[in-house]
Amino acid sequence: MRITWFGHSAFRLDFGASHVLIDPFFTGNPAFEGGDAARASAVEGATHILITHGHGDHVGDTLAVAGETGAKVVTNYDLCMWLASKGLTNFDPMNTGGTTDQGAFRVTLVHADHSAGMSEAGVTVPLGLPNGIIVRAAGEPTVYHMGDTDIFGDMALIQEIYRPDVLMVPIGDRFTMGAETAALAVRKFFAPKAVIPCHYGSFPIIAPSADAFVSALDGSGIQVVVPHKGTAVTIP
């Protein structure tokens, strides 16, 4: 599996014939680099778009990318219906605890401690529950994108049930857990092959770098991968 980070919480997974975007926040993302050409490359051939929750910095360019590529959107029911009201036609709704079969892989929505909603005419429209996302494909590492969340005790059950190999962990503080708490979550609950920090280095009110997270896991034996934005890393 090749994993590409685009800044903030936006990722792309490439394995076999599947090209999966998670939280495709490009337009307006201060951390996204390369402009229109980089965006075109990031979304090229996308087959699926997975969204952890209904906030603008995670829904991002979903409608535009789905229109450009025909990618299927997989997310919680309420957010799917809201996107459908905006013109989305190819979607697969689900909810917390559920699993959907996408053919080459399965998607499961798990718990996250956060909120979800978008502002319309000055009023916040609730968009279902926030989630983490588990991606499982035969012969590939199991990926757990935590979405936006704090640490919570039932991460132990996520480890017991899904045994993720790759964690995408929000570390930016203020809107999610910060570096030390995120490192505690990784050490206490998981045994991954690799951990990729995210949700930092974008907006000035969250952590500017992953340095504190990397330091907090120093000596743990856990591999922390801090990718260069837009450059794929391979996880066996």
From Swiss-Prot:
One of its GO terms (molecular function) is hydrolase activity. InterPro entries: Metallo-B-lactamas, RibonucZ/Hydroxyglut_hydro, UPF0173, UPF0173_UPF0282_UlaG_hydrolase. This is UPF0173 metal-dependent hydrolase Mnod_3315. HAMAP family: UPF0173. Belongs to the UPF0173 family. Keywords: Hydrolase. It holds the Pfam family Lactamase_B_3. It comes from the Bacteria. SUPFAM superfamilies: Metallo-hydrolase/oxidoreductase.
